[in-house]
């Protein structure tokens, strides 16, 4: 195996990514080197491409980016015991310290010292990625490489949707991007009574319909209160899944929640936007922030959903070779795509 590999690198502090030859990551005693077969583009990667304010403050240059992937093990460290070369795997993209109170209590997703693959350390937009053995997730034979490559965002959806009991509940999802749609699908399969998803992007609304969401609302044209009445809702929503990061959508969600409603918030909103906290207080709402996946309970649950028949394939709207990565990022930046999966083989 060559000691150099092809990778997408944030090589300059400006808009874009560049394909370069970089060293293959070194494998420590507790590490696993994975030959990447499929990579998916995340919204985080788009922020890095755009070199926005968050990226400028967060991403060291140069950096191999990317964190949504699947592949097979190419090499294992001397102390690795659970995996073998050739095994099909994906990986948890949050590297935790294992030493803080939350880690030692089994709450690794709450680690204060989390490092992100492709953000704080070299990522998976390369022919190889190296992660700790503890972050490796084996992929069952009945799950394809491309579905495994989107397990990271699917895990965000599963973690968000399953934050609260859904059986018999009316659920509002704001934001019909891929994670929002997957969250709505999880809610539907988990026994929710009514599942409503809102957005203002026609392409995303059509994608939600294609994947079988029953109540798809164009918030730029339809009044959510009228939709609720039309589908037989006499009270507000019991559970809200905020996936949009859009202040108007979040405010509308708060307005439409039932007293005692519960909201899981994954969408990253602009800093400093206003909400009416009196409504939160007097409605006695429960707000919960979500970041990433529970380690590793969420992974078990998402694998079970897929093996149980949840078809995520239609959420992948673009399948391209890695050399066409610019086309993939153009599709993502346009807002007129679902997931974009890139093939390294």
UniProtKB/Swiss-Prot annotation:
User: What would be one Gene Ontology cellular-component term for the protein?
Assistant: cytoplasm
UniProt-annotated location(s): Cytoplasm
Annotated site (Important for catalytic activity for the proton relay mechanism but does not participate directly in the coordination of zinc atom), which positions? 152
Q: What is its EC number?
A: 1.1.1.103
> What InterPro entries has UniProt attached to this entry?
ADH-like_C, ADH-like_N, ADH_Zn_CS, GroES-like_sf, L-Threonine_3-DHase, NAD(P)-bd_dom_sf, PKS_ER, Zn_alcohol_dh
Q: Which residues bind NAD(+)?
A: 179, 199, 204, 266-268, 290-291
Q: Does the keyword Metal-binding apply?
A: yes
**Stored PROSITE patterns:** ADH_ZINC
Top class in the EC scheme: oxidoreductase
Classification via SMART domains: PKS_ER
In Gene Ontology terms, what is a biological process of this protein?
L-threonine catabolic process to glycine
Keywords (alphabetical) are: Cytoplasm, Metal-binding, NAD, Oxidoreductase, Zinc
What highest taxon heads this organism's lineage? Bacteria
Cofactor binding comment, as recorded = Binds 2 Zn(2+) ions per subunit.
Q: Which cofactor does it need?
A: Zn(2+)
Q: Which residues form the active site?
A: 44 (charge relay system), 47 (charge relay system)
Annotated catalysed reactions: L-threonine + NAD(+) = (2S)-2-amino-3-oxobutanoate + NADH + H(+)
The residues that the entry says bind Zn(2+) 1 are: 42, 67-68
Pathway field: Amino-acid degradation; L-threonine degradation via oxydo-reductase pathway; glycine from L-threonine: step 1/2
Sequence positions that bind Zn(2+) 2: 97, 100, 103, 111
Q: Which family does it belong to?
A: Belongs to the zinc-containing alcohol dehydrogenase family.
Please give the subunit comment from the record.
Homotetramer.
Q: What does this protein do?
A: Catalyzes the NAD(+)-dependent oxidation of L-threonine to 2-amino-3-ketobutyrate.
Protein name per the record: L-threonine 3-dehydrogenase
Q: Native species of this protein?
A: Rhizobium johnstonii (strain DSM 114642 / LMG 32736 / 3841) (Rhizobium leguminosarum bv. viciae)
Q: Which gene encodes it?
A: tdh
